[in-house]
Swiss-Prot record:
Disulfide pattern: none
Keyword Membrane attached: yes
Topology in the lipid bilayer: Peripheral membrane protein; Lipid-anchor
List of residues that carry N-acetylmethionine: 1
Stated name of the protein: Synaptosomal-associated protein 23
């Protein structure tokens, strides 16, 4: 640089500024693409969470329906003069350890027990903006022109997007953990419902064959 004339130094400064500006534009473009991908992932997780809620509600409804079906079987046994165990069949099933472990004492999942947590920092598909650059700015100004203004703005946006991406990653991790727990709960409910249905089918077959 010592061998360069003032004009050449100025030309080189403008060249570096142009290259730096293009770099910040590319970085901003990549950051926006990453943010868009994150928003789409958040939306998909939200939709998946709603589907899991509907599935779990279906398991709860089957549980309620089976309780009524067991009551009907007990009444039919009485009407047919068949021997009924002293303990109510439904009570016996619902007092079992596996049933209580799955459904709790109430036998139904209250709304508070259904996983409903959704990402909190996304509103209508738009991430909540975080704070931008510090008061000193991101770049050291050389030419002090509109290009450096754009570079500063680009890097400020990148900094904000990176903050949003961090928040989205935390939200996605929490939501995935919650959904994994809900899937495990749904599996347990499905197994318990199947066992309950099998027992009811056996009782119904005995009633038909009697």
């Amino acid at each position: 640089m010592d061998d360069l004339s003032p004009e050449e130094i100025q030309l080189r400064a403008h060249q570096v500024t142009d290259e730096s500006l293009e770099s910040t534009r590319r970085i901003l473009g990549l950051a926006i693409e990453s943010q868009d991908a994150g928003i789409k992932t958040i939306t998909m997780l939200d939709e998946q969470g709603e589907q899991l809620n509907r599935i779990e509600e279906g398991m709860d409804q089957i549980n309620k329906d089976m309780r009524e079906a067991e009551k009907t079987l007990t009444e039919l046994n009485k009407c047919c003069g068949l021997c009924v165990c002293p303990c109510n069949r439904t009570k016996n099933f619902e007092s079992g350890k596996n049933y209580k472990a799955t459904w709790g004492d109430g036998g139904d999942s209250s709304p508070s027990n259904v996983v409903s947590k959704q990402p909190s920092r996304i509103t209508n598909g738009q991430p909540q903006q975080t704070t931008g650059a510090a008061s000193g700015g991101y770049i050291k100004r050389i030419t002090n022109d509109a290009r450096e203004d754009e570079m500063e703005e680009n890097l400020t946006q990148v900094g904000s997007i990176l903050g949003n991406l961090k928040n989205m990653a935390l939200d996605m991790g929490n939501e995935i953990d919650a959904q994994n727990q809900q899937i495990q709960k749904i599996t347990e409910k499905a197994d318990t419902n199947k066992n309950r249905i099998d027992i009811a089918n056996t009782r119904a077959k005995k009633l038909i064959d009697s």
